[in-house]
């Protein structure tokens, strides 16, 4: 790294990297600490493709910033010149902008022109590997990203794992990204794993992410049969006793769940791979969502919204004004649900106008238009208009 420790109060002119040496360290700073600064300083980073050998691939750095310490705040502008490809690897937590954000750290990112391979041991995401409690990521500007490939235990299109963290997308910015996300434990189009434990309501507006069309896959290995894969969250945990998590969209934005079922995973969900909650007094509310499921969903439990609601999870899940279309071949080894693949002690509340379309549905154990299988004490309440006329089993 150029700096071992760097204060967020530092004023930096544009730093142009021609080509870093190949070693497992951060590009700019291993650690950024919070100094005497009221607002974030803008740091401009540019990667040019020219060196003596003519090489254009930046290899083996773990992130631009390795670790943002508690309370640190940075505004990072990253420009990769045409022809530059970045390979971020070697760290426990890997992300192009930052590997690890500690509590209450704040990072604003603008990203221009990018072809990325990002791999971490534990957590990896395009922007950040791991976000701790209260950390905030603001994506102020982002070019269309193509050929982005992410892999780790917990892999996410944006962030590998996060706890009580915030992601904000700038006015007029809609993220558009293609490539692949592959994980051995959790895989998410946005977050590999996300945990929420606060009492106040948390809302995720996923309309800003309708351009995220990453192919989601489980890596082979001993953990495959318990891996959770979802187009927004691989694993979503509500650990509060009374808290509402809302996932909302708009009528014009379609969430594409593009599953690569080469390796059988534990759970596939069109929005959430696996959901876990502490109490029925906490709610997961999904509303105004359009989901198109494509690819081969080779999983033990498949649901077009949630693959599995975890064992011993007393979960309350509401679904309202949602349209689901499962367009390509989908196979589930155990349970297949129009909304939820498998649920233990859950209350599924369906209201408004909900439509599920899927042809040639099959599973080894159970198939259901709403829930594939309840283990025990499960309840489904139907209100409004629920249309399952286009959901039918294989002959």
Where in this protein do the model-derived segments appear?
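Surface-exposed loop/turn motifs in large extracellular/passenger domains
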Residues: 1-395
